[in-house]
């Protein structure tokens, strides 16, 4: 093999076999060349490429590195070396190597593009965006750079600019599928729903099996109040293996009181969770799946573990001896969480705590938003910030305890907490289950909703407050003007069972109980909160199938003022809770308005909030442990007016003294919990479960 002609011929054969995908044959020729010429540049480079194709990136890096020793200006080798570093997860080195490759003019654009992709992989979005700009400054016709720039801009919340970038790509290639698909996501961010549907059709005409686009189309149909079309698109996406589509198909059928396929959908959800498919954790909670399944769903949703980023450097406390608490939420707007938390925020002890608000949602102009903003010592809107930048801001502010009021719900930003926004991170109020995140240290709960024996199913350490964990606004007024039953569309005589829960909380087994109660109690009606007309129609049909006139189901319209909504509870006789997902704020509203609630305690956090609220309200006798007992108790209260009146009087007498409505007491317990968490952190102890002792 020392003859140059023989080496050249061997190289020719090696390249041909390599191009044909016959890697074993190509490898033999490369090896033979290197046996004769150990520093043969092309053989070193190509064998390195071959090793990378085989998945042996470490050996590929060694071989390509050897090739570069003999020709450091080889553009292909420089790019391959950088790309191999990226494959090995050595991103910082890869970026430096791409910079070297970019310095070789022959492939400057390609190297800069690869560098930008590496920055995307690292989550360094702003730098990636700048890198794509560099590529386009050299090659304005680089379609992939336009598309990737559009994707980055969409992720950064700059969807209008993203559309412009994607339209540039489509000017060069009108049928480019990736550009058309990316355009769907930008339009969806802008909530330009009609255009989203048009864009989806363009993609699906070229690629009818695009499950993600079917999923986006389904969500848009749902937003536009076209449930039949939405469910059909979710079905199509699920058939293509899109498990998040399964999640929403199941949830929205439940929302529409369509129970025809509940058993099959629940079985599919369980299979998906067991197979570690991406099932929305909230859906597992809504269907009352086992705590172990809720944990697995949450972990998978986050990516089979938290993927926590390295801890941020936390800012100095600027000489303050106050504990700095940051509440983080996408619900600082017209939302149940905002109404529940506001009284606690306003009452925090400012002599010992500095309270900071971090909003993940824009200002909706509501009165509660203004009140929320004013309740904080400092308030920051980070809607347009990246997760890393939001976490850095909190670190610079010296936040010691960060409280996640979302969990995996709409608008959540777990990436902020994954970047360790604070040394101590806590889940509270917004999500009645585990987040599944190893970067959330604690969950605030109570002994009823979350006994310590549930710790194996929670990634967070459980912290017990002495009473009901749920915060409430005890400054709310109940209108003194009680509307008549006739005004409310209710019969003037007869017993009124009431449940103002959202429709997805109404399960078939509970509805069975309700219909038996209506059959047993003469002239009784069931007063529900207004829901989608299909849900109302389906419930009417289900009632008729159980022998109950659908006209005995009466639906209350939305009340513009909270005080009027609370006041109309006086027209009802008894609130019936739901299972497996209890009423939470809704049940507490009923109790605040003076309406007794009957609940059945379930097997999950979400199914035990009613029990916790009733115990804290001093009415443990209204808590049952089975649907049979729940039905019997509701029936007895309806049949014995004196017994029901006794419960009503007891509720009224304790309204200002019971633990449920003592926000100062809750505040002292929550502050004690934060203090203990911080003391454990300062002492170097790992987070551990503990119980807060009662404080008067």
Language model regions located:
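Substrate-binding clefts and catalytic carboxylate motifs of secreted carbohydrate-active enzymes
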Residues: 496-509
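Conserved hydrophobic helix-helix packing surfaces used for dimerization/oligomerization
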Residues: 323-327, 497, 526
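Short hydrophobic "strand-cap" motifs at the C-terminus of beta-strands
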Residues: 328, 500-501, 529, 556
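Catalytic cores of eukaryotic secretory-pathway lumenal/extracellular enzymes that build
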Residues: 553, 557-559
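A conserved nucleotide-sugar
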Residues: 352-356, 515-544, 551
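A short structural motif in glycosyltransferase catalytic domains
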Residues: 578-580
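Alpha-helical solenoid repeat scaffolds of the TPR/TPR-like class and their adjacent stem/linker regions
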Residues: 1-491, 502, 512, 541-547, ...
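Donor-sugar nucleotide-binding helix/loop cap in glycosyltransferases
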Residues: 576, 590
């Amino acid at each position: 093999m020392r003859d140059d002609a023989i080496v050249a011929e061997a190289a020719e054969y090696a390249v041909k076999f390599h191009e044909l995908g016959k890697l074993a044959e190509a490898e033999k020729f490369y090896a033979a060349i290197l046996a004769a010429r150990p520093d043969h540049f092309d053989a070193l480079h190509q064998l390195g490429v071959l090793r990378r194709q085989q998945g042996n990136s470490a050996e590929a890096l060694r071989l390509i590195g050897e090739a570069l020793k003999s020709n450091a200006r080889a553009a292909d080798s420089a790019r391959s070396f950088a790309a191999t570093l990226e494959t090995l997860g050595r991103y910082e080195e890869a970026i430096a190597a791409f910079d070297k490759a970019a310095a070789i003019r022959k492939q400057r654009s390609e190297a800069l593009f690869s560098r930008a992709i590496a920055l995307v992989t690292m989550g360094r979005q702003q730098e990636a965006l700048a890198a794509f700009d560099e590529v386009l400054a050299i090659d304005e016709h680089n379609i992939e750079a336009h598309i990737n720039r559009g994707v980055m801009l969409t992720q950064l919340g700059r969807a209008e600019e993203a559309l412009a970038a994607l339209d540039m790509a489509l000017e060069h290639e009108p049928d480019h599928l990736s550009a058309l698909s990316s355009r769907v996501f930008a339009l969806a961010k802008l909530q330009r729903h009609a255009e989203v549907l048009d864009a989806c059709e363009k993609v699906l005409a070229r690629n009818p099996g695009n499950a993600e686009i079917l999923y986006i189309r389904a969500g848009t149909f749902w937003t536009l109040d076209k449930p039949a079309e939405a469910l059909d698109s979710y079905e199509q996406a699920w058939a293509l293996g899109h498990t998040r589509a399964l999640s929403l198909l199941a949830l929205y059928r439940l929302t529409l009181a369509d129970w025809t396929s509940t058993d099959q959908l629940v079985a599919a959800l369980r299979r998906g969770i067991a197979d570690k498919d991406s099932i929305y954790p909230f859906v597992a909670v809504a269907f009352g799946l086992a705590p172990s399944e809720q944990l697995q769903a949450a972990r998978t949703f986050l990516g089979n573990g938290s993927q926590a980023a390295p801890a941020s450097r936390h800012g100095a406390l600027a000489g303050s001896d106050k504990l700095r608490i940051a509440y983080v939420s996408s619900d600082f707007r017209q939302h149940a969480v905002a109404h529940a938390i506001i009284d606690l925020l306003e009452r925090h002890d400012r002599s010992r705590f500095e309270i900071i608000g971090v909003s993940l949602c824009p200002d909706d102009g509501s009165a509660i938003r203004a009140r929320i903003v004013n309740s904080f010592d400092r308030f920051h809107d980070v809607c347009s910030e990246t997760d890393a930048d939001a976490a850095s801001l909190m670190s610079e502010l010296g936040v010691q305890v960060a409280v996640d009021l979302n969990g995996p719900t709409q608008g959540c930003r777990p990436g902020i907490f994954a970047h360790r926004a604070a040394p101590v991170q806590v889940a509270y109020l917004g999500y009645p289950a585990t987040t599944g995140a190893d970067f959330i240290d604690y969950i605030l709960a109570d002994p009823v909703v979350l006994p310590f024996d549930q710790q194996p199913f929670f990634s967070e350490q459980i912290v017990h407050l002495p009473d009901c964990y749920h915060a409430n606004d005890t400054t709310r007024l109940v209108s003194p003007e009680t509307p008549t039953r006739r005004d409310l569309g209710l019969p003037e005589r007869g017993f009124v069972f009431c449940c103002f829960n959202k429709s997805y909380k109404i399960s078939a087994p509970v509805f069975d109980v309700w219909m038996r109660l209506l059959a047993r109690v003469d002239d009784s009606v069931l007063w529900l909160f207004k829901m989608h007309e299909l849900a109302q129609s389906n419930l009417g049909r289900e009632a008729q199938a159980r022998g109950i006139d659908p006209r005995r189901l009466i639906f209350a319209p939305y009340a513009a003022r909270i005080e009027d909504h609370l006041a109309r509870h006086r027209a009802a006789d008894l609130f019936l809770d739901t299972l497996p997902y209890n009423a939470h704020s809704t049940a507490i509203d009923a109790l605040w308005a003076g309406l007794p609630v009957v609940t059945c305690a379930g097997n999950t956090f979400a199914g035990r909030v009613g029990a916790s609220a009733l115990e804290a309200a001093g009415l443990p006798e209204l808590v049952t442990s089975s649907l049979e007992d729940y039905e019997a108790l509701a029936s007895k209260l309806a049949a014995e007016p004196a017994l029901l009146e006794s419960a009503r009087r007891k509720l009224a007498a304790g309204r200002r003294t019971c633990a449920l409505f003592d926000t100062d007491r809750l505040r002292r317990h929550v502050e004690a919990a934060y203090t203990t968490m911080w003391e454990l952190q300062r002492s170097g102890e790992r987070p551990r479960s503990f119980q807060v002792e009662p404080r008067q």
